[in-house]
Amino acid sequence: MLRLGSHVSMSGKKMLLGASEEAASYGSNTFMIYTGAPQNTRRKPIEELNIEAGLEHMKAHDMADIVVHAPYIINIGNSVKPETFELGVNFLQSEIERTRALGAKQIVLHPGAHVGEGADKGIKQIIQGLNEALIHDQDVQIALETMAGKGSECGRTFEEIAQIIDGVTHNELLSVTFDTCHTHDAGYDIVNDFDGVLNEFDKIIGVDRLKVLHINDSKNECGAHKDRHANIGFGHIGFDALHYIVHHPQLADVPKILETPYVGEDKASKKAPYKWEIAMLRNGEFDPDLLNKIQNS
């Protein structure tokens, strides 16, 4: 079954219930959340996440295979500042616990940045961090995200992701998030040869590890190493390529999550595009006037 949704907010008193309600309003049947603000460590206790009511709403609205995203502040690739590395390991462990409590099986993680020390050193540090953070009996997988190669990001090639996986002792607890914008920006031609790219992924990593898809268009050309998301069909990847990926038979059971930008001139008037983009990806017809329609809705 096609599981298609977006990033939604989990906040206020409603927490998980609010996230599921927002997802349902977009016509989603899955969604992705952060368990708190992605840029800091402040977190509500698990008891305040309103999990029971959230799970009930999800069941009633056929929501499944939800995904958690780890916060950006985790950088287990940092070999320069031990305190940053330690914070990353400890915080990742607590986020895994929260993911499990929410009933999710996948927590998406940006592998890490080597902060100028070189990819080999960064990857070695990431492996060490994952070996420390992973608890053998956990049923949550860390879904390492394919990165665009901006700055000193590790995980910009399938080989780098494979290197991390191969170095981790309990790597059955690792999976991969394939981000269309990042992979395109990293230099993979998903527009003209997605099957070839998927084949390469399968040879190097194994397609059975691909557990989450981030569906985003890109504001930049292939190989730009920028990572700037565009609305579906309004970037350099284009609607046809993204529709092909969303409906790809080999990826039928993988949840597909949109992280496209809100539409509008200023912060106050910006609107979530997900209801429209999800409908468009489901029905297979691109609407070139979509952004105007969203703004005027």
Swiss-Prot record:
SMART domains reported for this sequence: AP2Ec
Binding residues annotated for Zn(2+) 1, in chain numbering: 69, 110, 145
Transcription is among the record's keywords: no
Recorded GO MF terms: deoxyribonuclease IV (phage-T4-induced) activity; DNA binding; DNA-(apurinic or apyrimidinic site) endonuclease activity; phosphoric diester hydrolase activity; zinc ion binding
Protein biosynthesis in keyword set: no
Bound cofactor: record note: Binds 3 Zn(2+) ions.
Reactions catalysed according to its record: Endonucleolytic cleavage to 5'-phosphooligonucleotide end-products
Residues noted as binding Zn(2+) 3 in the record, renumbered to the chain: 182, 227, 229
Domain of life: Bacteria
Listed Pfam families: AP_endonuc_2
Example of a GO biological process term: base-excision repair
HAMAP family: Nfo
Protein name (record): Probable endonuclease 4
Organism: Listeria monocytogenes serotype 4b (strain CLIP80459)
